[in-house]
Curated annotation (Swiss-Prot):
<dbReference type="GO" id="GO:0141221">
    <property type="term" value="F:histone deacetylase activity, hydrolytic mechanism"/>
</dbReference>
<feature type="binding site">
    <location>
        <position position="298"/>
    </location>
    <ligand>
        <name>substrate</name>
    </ligand>
</feature>
<feature type="binding site">
    <location>
        <position position="171"/>
    </location>
    <ligand>
        <name>a divalent metal cation</name>
    </ligand>
</feature>
<keyword id="KW-0378">Hydrolase</keyword>
<dbReference type="InterPro" id="IPR000286">
    <property type="entry name" value="His_deacetylse"/>
</dbReference>
<dbReference type="InterPro" id="IPR050284">
    <property type="entry name" value="HDAC_PDAC"/>
</dbReference>
<keyword id="KW-0963">Cytoplasm</keyword>
<feature type="binding site">
    <location>
        <position position="94"/>
    </location>
    <ligand>
        <name>substrate</name>
    </ligand>
</feature>
<feature type="region of interest" description="Disordered">
    <location>
        <begin position="372"/>
        <end position="495"/>
    </location>
</feature>
<dbReference type="InterPro" id="IPR023696">
    <property type="entry name" value="Ureohydrolase_dom_sf"/>
</dbReference>
<dbReference type="GO" id="GO:0005737">
    <property type="term" value="C:cytoplasm"/>
</dbReference>
<dbReference type="GO" id="GO:0000118">
    <property type="term" value="C:histone deacetylase complex"/>
</dbReference>
<comment type="similarity">
    <text>Belongs to the histone deacetylase family. HD type 1 subfamily.</text>
</comment>
<dbReference type="GO" id="GO:0031507">
    <property type="term" value="P:heterochromatin formation"/>
</dbReference>
<keyword id="KW-0804">Transcription</keyword>
<feature type="active site" description="Proton acceptor">
    <location>
        <position position="136"/>
    </location>
</feature>
<dbReference type="GO" id="GO:0046872">
    <property type="term" value="F:metal ion binding"/>
</dbReference>
């Protein structure tokens, strides 16, 4: 039986959001995942929390004020009034305006911040938010289906209590937004295993190693089509083992994008659920506090399979391959099994290619200072303490939550067809981006005391009755909060 304390964040509103017809990103996959988690009985081994929605001030700990204000105001009905801002903030095409877009961002980011709060307070050893992992969003720009970067916000929360945080990305796409945010600091190390070449976002070369104090603290392993379980683990394990030894993080954040699985609508890797989940299992062996987030994944039946299986790994629960009855059983036919089989695609990642890159990256790690220390600073207040507002429901009754979810389906939502419009454009036709200082975050500024999450999150409470909030005494404080100046020079000092 698992001795790890595991927290799991889920909001039943998240699956109601819809990017639009033929768009590959389908938030409905989170509802499917949660339904499998419930019906496999995994939920009994976790504490389940509905996340607090991130406030405007919380989001602007990384994002610019004008960008967040725009996301808050724009809707499909009034978007014609924001034509200049749509271009400025890249909210178009792959990042469309959709109903409830800002609410979706609040849920995703609030869950990932909540994960960090649980880890910081030592109430959890592992915290999960499958609605998070939106790693492409920039400080003032949407990108790659991502509007707010919940990962950066979660890491900033972790940095309140941990000198060093390690970020690992196993999505098929490079974790560019997170890398850019922390490119010049040694307090966050980013490690990304991704498809590289004529493929979105076009960044993540092995030569991209960080800058200034962050030099050698960005590590990229560019991969080719068709990598399988064995090849992936032959690089993941030695690289991560060395990173853990050299860097010695106080906490680890892993983005578990499921588009690196075989058969993904936009992907070109050949990993099975077991191969993907072995990354999680390996990280568990280090017994370091772990935040586990979602990410990409566009064959949604496999996304749900993957994240359910990885949830079971985190709570040490064995699952039968035969899927239990669930509300979305028809999605999983005709096999109705948990595990998937690899296809016969060629693995273009030769042993020589992988070995050469592995040696190069291990050599880069030797340039690191062992476990760099941050300057002493006062610890800012934690974000909202979920212990003050835990759900009093009997956990065994939670399975009925699936029946309480709003069943909002949209035309085309059930399809994983490769023939839908946009497959080619979404997978590798988007314009590549480059690392930019304007997308970085000031860690030294964040070390200074900021308003607590408790005081700045209550604007959302009146609209979130499902959260059973008990903290209504702070509502009068929100309007007095001041945003940071996004035009200030970026300072990435360690302390």
């Amino acid at each position: 039986m698992s001795t790890r304390k595991v927290s799991y964040f889920y909001d039943n509103e998240v699956g109601n959001h819809y990017y639009g017809p033929n768009h590959p990103m389908k938030p409905h996959r989170m509802r499917m995942t949660h339904d499998l988690v419930l019906n496999y009985g995994i939920y009994k081994k976790m504490q389940i929390f509905r996340p607090r929605k991130a406030s405007e001030l919380e989001l602007t700990n990384f994002h610019s004020d004008d960008y967040i204000n725009f996301l808050k105001l724009v809707t499909p009905d009034n978007m014609h009034d924001y034509s200049k801002q749509l271009v400025k903030f890249n909210v178009r095409e792959d990042c469309p305006v959709f109903d409830g877009m800002y609410n979706f961002c609040q849920i995703s980011s609030g869950g990932s911040i909540g994960c960090a709060v649980k880890v910081n307070s030592k109430e959890s050893d592992v915290a999960i938010n499958w609605a998070g992992g939106l790693h492409h969003a920039k400080k003032s720009e949407a990108s790659g289906f991502c509007y707010t970067n919940d990962i950066v916000l979660s890491i900033l929360e972790l940095l309140k209590h941990h000198e060093r945080v390690l970020y690992i990305d196993i999505d098929i796409h490079h974790g560019d937004g997170v890398e850019e945010a922390f490119y010049t600091t040694d307090r966050v190390m980013t490690v990304s295993f991704h498809k590289y070449g004529d493929y979105f976002p076009g960044t993540g070369d092995v030569k991209d190693i960080g800058a200034d104090k962050g030099k050698y603290y960005s590590l990229n392993f560019p991969l080719k089509d068709g990598i399988d379980d064995e090849s992936y683990q032959s690089i993941f394990r030695p690289i991560i083992r060395s990173v853990m030894d050299f860097y010695r993080p106080g906490a680890v954040v892993i983005q578990c994008g499921a588009d690196s699985l075989t058969g993904d609508r936009l992907g070109c890797f050949n990993l099975t659920l077991r191969g993907h989940a072995q990354c999680i299992e390996f990280l568990k062996s280090f017994n370091v506090p772990l935040v586990v987030l979602g990410g990409g994944g566009y064959t949604i039946k496999n996304v749900a399979r993957c994240w359910t299986y990885e949830t079971s790994i985190l709570v040490d629960s064995e699952l039968k391959d035969e899927l239990p009855y669930n509300d979305y059983l028809e999605y999983y036919g005709p096999e109705y099994r948990l595990h998937i089989t690899p296809n016969n695609m060629e693995n273009q990642n030769t042993k020589d290619y992988l070995e050469k890159l592995k040696i190069q990256l291990l050599e880069n790690l030797r340039n690191l200072n062992h476990a760099p220390a941050a300057a002493h600073h006062d610890i800012p207040p934690d974000s909202f303490n979920y212990s003050d507002d835990e759900d009093d429901e009997d956990p065994d009754v939670r399975i009925s939550e699936a029946d309480r979810d709003k069943k909002v389906h949209h035309q085309g939502e059930l399809s994983d067809s490769d023939e839908e419009d946009g497959r080619r454009n979404y997978s590798n036709g988007l314009e590549a981006t480059s690392t930019s200082r304007r997308n970085q975050v000031s860690i030294s500024a964040y070390d200074k005391e900021r308003p607590s999450y408790n005081s700045r999150n209550n604007n959302n409470n009146n609209n979130n009755n499902n959260n059973n909030n008990n903290n209504n005494n702070n509502n009068s404080n929100n309007n007095n909060s001041h945003h940071h100046n996004e035009d200030a020079d970026v300072d990435m000092d360690s302390g």
